[in-house]
Structure formats: C-alpha cells, structure tokens
Amino acid sequence: MYYKTINVPIVLEVGEDIFVHLDDILKENHLYFKEKILVTSMELRDLYKSRLDKLSFEDILFIKGGSYDEALEVMNTITNKEVLLVAFGGGSIIDAVKLMANTLDLTYITVPSTLSNDAIYSPIARLLKDGKKQSFGVKAPLGIIADVNIIKGSPEKLLLAGVGDLVSNASAVKDWYLAHIDKGESINNFAMALASLSGNSVIPYTFNDIRSSRFIGDLANGLVISGLAMVLANSSRPASGAEHMISHAIDDLFPNRSTLHGLQVAWGHLLVERDFRKPENDYEKLMIFFE
C-alpha cells in the first residue's frame, strides 16, 4: 500500500501557565537541545519577565516590526547552528522566526502571545519586503506551546482577527473545489476536511466567550489543524481563497490603510459570499455570526 508522509508537530500543548514548563515539555517529548534562543519583542520580554526568568536561554533576540530585512539582520547574529529557536510573540515575530529557521535550517517552536492568524503552524511566512507584504514558503515548526493565560491577556481585536482567519477556511475550501470543477485542479479531500472542521470549531462561540479558556483552546487547536491542512496539501489552498486575495490586495494597494490580516480576510469572506456565491451563499449566516 502507498501512503503520503507529512511532517506533523511533535509537540502540541495548550493549557494554562504552561510556558514556564517549556524545558519539562521538551524532555517529556525526548527533545534535547544544547541551547535555546528566545526570539521575542522587548515589550513581551518586559511584560513576562518573571516567567521568562524561570527558563534558561543562551540568548534573547528582539524583533520590532517583523520585516524581511529585520529578520535577516537578526538571523545573522546567530552563530550556533545547533540551537532551538523559541518564537514568542504574535504573527510578525513568528513569521520572522520561520524565515530565520528555514534559511539557517534550524528547528523552532512557536509560543503565541495571541492568536490573530494561523501563523502558529502554517508553512508560510508573510513579511514586509520592498514595501509590500510577501509570502515565503517555510518549514512548519517542531511544536506549538499555547499558554492560555498569556493569550487571554492579548487585545480582543487580535483574537477576533484569529477567528476571522480561521472561519474563512469555509470560503477557501469552496474556491478550491470550484477550481477543481472548473479548471481540473487537483484536490486533497483529507486536507479539505481538516480545513473545514478546523474552521467550524469556533462557530458555537459568541463574543462573550473570547476570554474563556475553552474558546482559546479551541481557537488554538483550530489554527494548528488549519496549518496542518496546508502542510498536507503542500499548498495554502485549504486556508486561502478569494477572501485572502482581497486581503493581500488591500495590503498591496493601500498599505497605509490596511489592518489586521484576519479582520481583512473576514471582510473579504463576507464580500465574496454576498456578491459572488450565487444562488446559494452563507452571507446571512456569516453576518449573524460576526455580529
């Protein structure tokens, strides 16, 4: 029999106050590294200093804006090629570490400080280069450690963006299937199923739930599974359709007016459902959910 082999995260930990147990989590999974380098922002370092002081890092590197050039600049300071990179931050920091790890062929894990998009486990990094947001293919992380209590402290706007990014999988899957019917593009039913299931995982929740541990856990797991769908498809297709193209166009054409990726994607999702998916669409259902 024939099987498809894919890389899946060795570590997936979602829980309260688990970041301080990073070393124990690595040992429990038989992962041993001589050194670890933390990549984060100065703001997060200062905010979570008491927790970070309980962990041992060979060095701490700081990311400000998360541009392509900044990622290369920070990357060039890494001389030890046998370290584990720990990306602690939002999408910009995680995407910068993805590029660094991919270029240097280093192993990395993600520790999201918020859940604004699927950066925590997608094989794609979106970075500002030459004045425009660009996508770069990268390897997925070795693992994800989502500390619910840290994520709870992030602005609600970021969490809502994460919901928008995840729910938009429904639109992406429709576009992928349309390309299959209309253009003969190959599809992966397993990847489509993962993308759909992960997108549906947050539908039962309301705005009042966004600080709850259960919601944070389901959002984190959903974003990871969405990333896994992309890894399985070897493409962003399961989680990126017309709604993402609209968001990318906003970034390209109106860089000074663009906002969070997940919020733009949610708006694009509504636009596509309302104006292009006829005669049947999910526009009314989406409006009720987003309201």
Residue spans for each PLM region:
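Short glycine/serine/threonine-rich phosphate/pyrophosphate-binding segments
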Residues: L47, S92-K98, N117-I120, A239
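A glycine/threonine-rich phosphate-anchoring loop and its flanking beta-alpha core
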Residues: T103-S198
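Short beta-strand/turn micro-motifs composed of small residues
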Residues: V39-T40, G89, P112, A146
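Structural motif
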Residues: K36-I37, V83-L84, T107-I109, L142-I144, ...
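ATP/NTP phosphate-donor binding region
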Residues: M1-L84
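A short, small-residue-rich loop immediately preceding and capping a beta-strand
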Residues: K81-M100, L104-L115
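Active-site segments that bind and position negatively charged phosphate/pyrophosphate groups
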Residues: N189-F289
